[in-house]
Amino acid sequence: MRVVFFGTPQFAVPTLQQLLDAPDVEVMAVVSQPDRRRGRGNQVSASPVKALAIAYDLPVWQPERLRRDPEVLSQLQQTQADAFVVVAYGQLLPAEVLAMPRLGCINVHGSLLPAYRGAAPIQWSLINGDRETGIVTMQMDVGMDTGPMLLRWTTPIALDDNSQTLGDRLATAGAELLLQTLRQLDQGHLTAISQNEAEATYARLLQKEDFQLSWDQSALELHNRIRGLYPGASLPVQGDRLKVLASLPLGLGLLLSAAYADWQDWQPDPAAQPGTVLAIAKSLGPIVATREGALLLLQVQPAGRKPLSGWDWANGLRLQEGLSLLE
């Protein structure tokens, strides 16, 4: 089976690798977003998908706007591919591209469609505190994630999952599901199912202000946002912003893992002002009052420094019970 792969970020890499490893698949070319400034050094660099393609000596095409690039459109047509596989590419495919391959254009999407159509499904499933998510393969149409669905895979979302751990799990599962989808399509064994438009929701692009959290939010809301926005969510501390990389909501009756059993029934002082240190959990970190419940800071990253445990951070600042982090 001849395929062209469209993808850009790390999330798409396992699917491309799965196709490269499959004995019955020939990857003809890769289409990825143009090189951008990335990482801490803000240097222009190739996307993770392009880097893998280059390692396998595959042709890589990087149109700024696919629909306005006649050369790439012509090259796609000339591949005579059986299918175009699309994973987090970053551009909508025009109708003329969707019509090119024999089996159509197959997309791997990181949610249980029609929920969370759009650019950030993994992040919003965590932010909203969902307990289950998954992967769907679908036959693409001209809309954004609106095409008929083919196969799906589900997974529970754990309380300590974040966008990286959940994204890695979904990426691995999506790679396997995509290969199953292609093989079953090629054999004529799959029937596409239309999405229910009445159940559609959207996962909008994240904005800078989404990452600016406040102690006036509830502990559960803060925890979910810290997980979904990993590793970028921050809270105000002593006139600066502190990135919080891992946390645990306490005092809300949630079932905690065995590692935190000592804090299962702990309750915060309901009169404490949000941002007040309520306790220092030994070997773990500070417990801070919020609008509802309290938040245990397990891993943090002060501005300009490397990540460290909440325990080490609290000891370094000599935090004490009753101290307000807002002062």
From Swiss-Prot:
One of its GO terms (cellular component) is cytosol. Keywords: Protein biosynthesis, Transferase. (6S)-5,6,7,8-tetrahydrofolate binds at residues 111-114. It is an enzyme of class 2 (transferase). It comes from the Bacteria. It catalyses: L-methionyl-tRNA(fMet) + (6R)-10-formyltetrahydrofolate = N-formyl-L-methionyl-tRNA(fMet) + (6S)-5,6,7,8-tetrahydrofolate + H(+). Belongs to the Fmt family. Attaches a formyl group to the free amino group of methionyl-tRNA(fMet). The formyl group appears to play a dual role in the initiator identity of N-formylmethionyl-tRNA by promoting its recognition by IF2 and preventing the misappropriation of this tRNA by the elongation apparatus. HAMAP family: Formyl_trans (MF_00182). This is Methionyl-tRNA formyltransferase. It comes from Synechococcus elongatus (strain ATCC 33912 / PCC 7942 / FACHB-805) (Anacystis nidulans R2).
